[in-house]
Amino acid sequence: ARELRRGTLQLIEDIAPYRHLGIEPPPLHLLINRVHPVSANARLIQQALRDLFQGHTGIRVLATDVPAIEAYPRAATRGLPVHRVEYRQPVGRVAPAALATMRDLAGELLPQWQDRFAAVPGRPPQPLDTRRPHSQRT
């Protein structure tokens, strides 16, 4: 957490001179990725990061955390968006479905589009298969 803080603050200092040229740096949103959903240590680190950046103008730690679940590497391997790979939370798992996480993250970054994100279906549309008889379709 300290290394992230040091590096982030150094980056902000490095780009500060651009303000004199009229270039205002955009707000920085920090995403906590690959969070183990039931780890007490992960929760402590998350809270420490939030506390470290709480008073800094232009830096915000996002409230949405991306959990360390198998759906993300599986989606990457298949070349698909994760919300199409895991649209329902598996039974017995603490972490939310990837679709719910992506909706929360997108809504946090672009709150004016939250209703549109809520309408995104997780399941990809199924093409009509009219070449095979109905009895052979799956």
What are these model-predicted stretches?
Residues 1-62:
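Conserved catalytic-core segment of NTP-binding enzymes
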Residues 35-36, 70-72:
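Short, internal active-site loops enriched in acidic
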Residues 71-106:
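C-terminal boundary of histidine-terminating zinc-finger modules
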Residues 106-120:
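Short, hydrophobic alpha-helical segments
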Residues 130-138:
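Long, low-complexity, intrinsically disordered segments
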